Amino acid sequence: MKQQTEVKKRFKMYKAKKHWVVAPILFIGVLGVVGLATDDVQAAELDTQPGTTTVQPDNPDPQVGSTTPKTAVTEEATVQKDTTSQPTKVEEVASEKNGAEQSSATPNDTTNAQQPTVGAEKSAQEQPVVSPETTNEPLGQPTEVAPAENEANKSTSIPKEFETPDVDKAVDEAKKDPNITVVEKPAEDLGNVSSKDLAAKEKEVDQLQKEQAKKIAQQAAELKAKNEKIAKENAEIAAKNKAEKERYEKEVAEYNKHKNENGYVAKPVNKTLIFDREATKNSKVVSVKAAEYIDAKKLTDKHKDKKLLISMLSVDSSGLTTKDSKKAHFYYNNGAGGTLVVLHKNQPVTITYGNLNASYLGKKIASAEFQYTVKATPDSKGRLNAFLHDDPVATIVYGINIDPRTKKAGAEIEMLVRFFGEDGKEILPTKENPFVFSGASLNSRGENITYEFVKVGNTDTVHEINGSKVARHGNKVYSKTDIDVGTNGISISDWEAVQGKEYIGATVISTPNRIKFTFGNEIVNNPGYDGNSMWFAFNTDLKAKSITPYQEKGRPKQPEKATIEFNRYKANVVPVLVPNKEVTDGQKNINDLNVKRGDSLQYIVTGDTTELAKVDPKTVTKQGIRDTFDAEKVTIDLSKVKVYQADASLNEKDLKAVAAAINSGKAKDVTASYDLHLDQNTVTAMMKTNADDSVVLAMGYKYLLVLPFVVKNVEGDFENTAVQLTNDGETVTNTVINHVPGSNPSKDVKADKNGTVGSVSLHDKDIPLQTKIYYEVKSSERPANYGGITEEWGMNDVLDTTHDRFTGKWHAITNYDLKVGDKTLKAGTDISAYILLENKDNKDLTFTMNQALLAALNEGSNKVGKQAWSVYLEVERIKTGDVENTQTENYNKELVRSNTVVTHTPDDPKPTKAVHNKKGEDINHGKVARGDVLSYEMTWDLKGYDKDFAFDTVDLATGVSFFDDYDETKVTPIKDLLRVKDSKGEDITNQFTISWDDAKGTVTISAKDPQAFILAHGGQELRVTLPTKVKANVSGDVYNLAEQNTFGQRIKTNTVVNHIPKVNPKKDVVIKVGDKQSQNGATIKLGEKFFYEFTSSDIPAEYAGIVEEWSISDKLDVKHDKFSGQWSVFANSTFVLADGTKVNKGDDISKLFTMTFEQGVVKITASQAFLDAMNLKENKNVAHSWKAFIGVERIAAGDVYNTIEESFNNEKIKTNTVVTHTPEKPQTPPEKTVIVPPTPKTPQAPVEPLVVEKASVVPELPQTGEKQNVLLTVAGSLAAMLGLAGLGFKRRKETK
């Protein structure tokens, strides 16, 4: 509805005594929305348009309540279904309800007031009964309170930070300690707290923060005590380290005083590695891994004479080995234990020691691994026998037997030492503090005899001892001079195991890497040894003066640090919000009531902020209302939306109280403090915000959002639920609902059965031209228990005057029982007297209820049940095409379009006719001859008649048929070959009754079941074939046309014509072939020979037929004429044969014919080759005929008559009759009778051979003869006899 201002004008009728007055009701602005109405009621007339012409129907009924005779009677009243009225677009009209309303009348009802129908009685019983005294309008259902627990709610929460004074104080104290880092954790989230439980939660938080403050103070005190203890221990460590440093410095100074003395090295050596007897005294062998062991028992048993370990090892161990390491363990007589193994060249043997107490720079060495690999041995098998000491610092003794005569021998073993800490990780030295170990007891008798050595790597350092004979020579460390037997003044007794002298045969080695070196002995000039052996000990028992390295007695500890964490407390305060929704018509609650299109209603949504007063107002950053409405049902004008601030005590469900608060100003208009937004079907009203994002209005109030809506023309229920928006939460209101009953006008089209409205819908049907039909213009239904006022009700129909002509006839009926004054008009009663027609050019037709009928409709008794009405207007279809028609209903100035009905009027049928020859060629206007078949081919046009044909508009008795009028004087129908076929070529002839009228030359083909026939074959072109045959001896033009009848509509086909030339065969008598002198009527001597001459009929030029047969039959008068056996045929025109052979006029063409003579009848028949030639296209441009000669001998006197019968396409005609006269001979004595034997069979006389370019013509002569096998000579020889050779075929000339 068009809204011009905020004032919506509506009219309501009131009955004052016996008259109806119309009073305007004004709803002014938003205040009017909530209940401000005028008290002044004035009479007013309904507006009428100037210049309107109103007319009464063609059959005004002077008696109110009488029925119209214009509707047909049906068994029951039904509501138009989908098949009769197709709904249009949704925005125009909703689909109609299925099923029938029993109180509704269709145009087929003829119910009058005196004879109510069963349907009307039933309708009255089913409609609710309302007391006539009841004047109250329906009351809306009270709305419910929105449930607090709603799945649609999103928790509305306001952040709340609680105060923690005790925690703050404890934190400040803790921050004074530099060793304490105070970290504030995220505030502990106490979850959601109802605004009603907030006070209790604050007490709970106060207790929590006090307990936390106590814990913080305790943590700070404990850390302080720990750090005071650390400070005391650090002072003690500092004192010890100072004393250690003083010791070290003093020891270094003392060392330096003696560094040039024997037993000292030039530079003080720090003994970083402790791996001596004391450190290994509790060691245990963990494992020995060798490929081969020496069985100790076998060894001692075999070599009992050897007492020394070196001697025992310097033997051949063959046969003494074992794989069992336990059998190899052996205790030497001095009590030293170990494992006997066989070392093989380049095959490592490993022994692992555990339970050590060694150390490196104070770090404990818990285990050690010694790996031995033989690099050189005098044994040819690469063996060395060895004894691996259980004591790691005693290490190894090896030996092998040698031939005493051997001058040179030597052995060399690589040793790899790995140390492991208590954690199992390998301990390695640093460059600053390398491993330092002893290289002692290196015996030597001089480098020219024998010596023991140690080989070192490039990164190893050899620290030579003052006074020692052992020095580094290349990568070997040994003594070059004799220190064993005294040849140089030093014997082994001077230093081996002599306290203070052991340095003579020793050195000190250091390495920054894992310990890896080689040891062994070298015999340069064997003094007579039978074994090669050596004892090597690895340890840190240095044979030189060393300095105990400086070792810290402890490192000062750093004061302990502590991180004290604390947290504050927060919660999400969930305010108890109870938003509310009401729907009103401006004065009262209309929840759950019916409304109709165009009605105004308002939603009042209350946003409850009462509980939000308990939180910090700055934490409320979003506050508003969102209303999502059903945009299909209602529209809104955003400019009229208002928001009011009301006191928290207002009962928003009391609409009177709400109106009073607004009208008095107690509820303030705060619309300016809101941002209003409309997005499609959602209205959002949000409070504006301050610079700090808090809302501008105070909490603790109720905010009323007033939303004005107008109902659309869409039926159905529509609910509305709003949402209060608070920060990130949503709280759903209660739901209100209204109902819009179906109110859709409809349109249909019905047949006009001689002024009576048909019962079947013609929507989407095919309607013939010049057919009269009714448009059914049906109003929407006004609902039962209607509470509104019908101010205006009309229907407009704009005709398509290009296709439809309004005849001026119309009538209207009520579709439900209607009381007018003291009379009750039953459903179906004519109410045309109450309807005004505005007719503009017979095209724009508007039917409107007059004031009397409107007044009656607004009576309370007529509001109990439904109301509706229909108009039927008659039109004539005057042009083919598709025709659409839609009506527009005006109900209280709200315009609604109905569905659109469509009818189709196809073009008139266009049946056609053609005439074909046997080849199927179109020969219309062609020349034909007797015996030709004229096949009349017709199209039966049913394209405009299919399953959508409106059978209700025609008289089925007129049927569907096809009529053909053939020329019975010139053609004969071949009845058995008449066929009707559908568009697919299927024969459907049996579906018709075929009636022949031979006297009139007609045939009628009638569908046995016209309706079923149209349903089955409508929309097609059928093919009708009627073959006929041209009669004999007829000439002139033969015409043919047909007529199609479709339910009384008769349409003729085009006319076809063929031309039949006059038949002209001729008979004559000549003495010789080629004579010009006719002997017809002349005298023929007895015994004289002559010829009967025959000239055939002409095949006309441009002949359209097919030559299928051509012959002549000459029945001789055998009493007078004797067939001589001579015959010939000559061409009367030039033509070509199928193989291209040219035949000229006058050529003898006998070979293209055959002759038979039976029972006195000479028959000459054209061959197929001649017939084919006659049918060639290239021979059609000229007329063709031929001439035949039959030779006879006159054998008796008398008048002799002769007629030849010509057969063309098996149609026979006779020529003219010729006559000759033969007188009797004079009487002479009889001659002696001579018996003549039967004529023997003689070959046919050959015709002069034809010389042709193509030898496709068989050169055999025609056969003659009778059934008695009497052979006659061929007349071909006659040509030579008569000198007619010049009549033979001409040879074609070829151009080479």
UniProtKB/Swiss-Prot annotation:
SUPFAM superfamilies attached to this UniProt entry: V-region of surface antigen I/II (SA I/II, PAC)
Keywords: Cell wall, Peptidoglycan-anchor, Plasmid, Secreted, Signal
InterPro entries found in the cross-reference section: Adh_isopep-form_adh_dom (IPR026345), AgI/II_N (IPR041324), Antigen_C (IPR032300), Glucan-bd_C/Surface_Ag-I/II_V (IPR013574), KxYKxGKxW (IPR022263), LPXTG_anchor (IPR019931), SA_I/II_PAC_V_sf (IPR036234)
Subcellular location: Secreted, Cell wall
Short sequence motif named LPXTG sorting signal, residue ranges: 1261-1265
GO CC term (a single one): extracellular region
PROSITE patterns tied to this protein: GRAM_POS_ANCHORING (PS50847)
Residue ranges, compositional bias (Basic and acidic residues): 89-99, 160-178
Domain of life: Bacteria
Modification Pentaglycyl murein peptidoglycan amidated threonine occurs at: 1264
Membrane topology value: Peptidoglycan-anchor
Transmembrane segments: none
Tagged with keyword DNA repair: no
Prosegment residue ranges: 1265-1296
Region (Disordered): 48-188, 1221-1245
Function: Aggregation substance allows donor and recipient strains to form tight aggregates which allow the non-motile bacteria to maintain physical contact over a period of time sufficient to permit conjugative transfer of the sex pheromone plasmid from donor to recipient strains.
Family: Belongs to the antigen I/II family.
Protein name: Aggregation substance
Name of encoding gene: asa1
